[in-house]
Amino acid sequence: MILNEIFHECIKDLGGIVSVASTGTDGKPHIANTWNKYLIITEDEKILIPCFGFRKTEKNAETQPYVEIVVGSDKVQGKMGMGTGCLLSGTAKFEKDGALFNLVHDKLKFANRVLIFTPESCKQTI
């Protein structure tokens, strides 16, 4: 199991933010954001992120699928007080049809694609 208890506690805070960092072919980082409330976790621990924007992230993932994601909440006890987060590393791919897209689109009609994130690690940050 890669996704730890702190991760699951953080995403219960529906107002918490999610940041997705990707790298372009020019080597420059790009950050895109969404909300915890939109994440869907599959039984095999894939994280599904509904997308309407995320165009640059999608373009970056075509050539460099390795991304990092940060989730956080100020309502979860951290190592030094209230507030903590998790840094996740793994790979991303985008789909605009298929079973995982349909799962997301059935719940969130604005999604015209889904970012499918496969985590390789999940570490508490603070």
Walk through the language-model features, giving the residues of each:
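Binding-site signature for planar aromatic cofactors or substrates
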Residues: 1-126
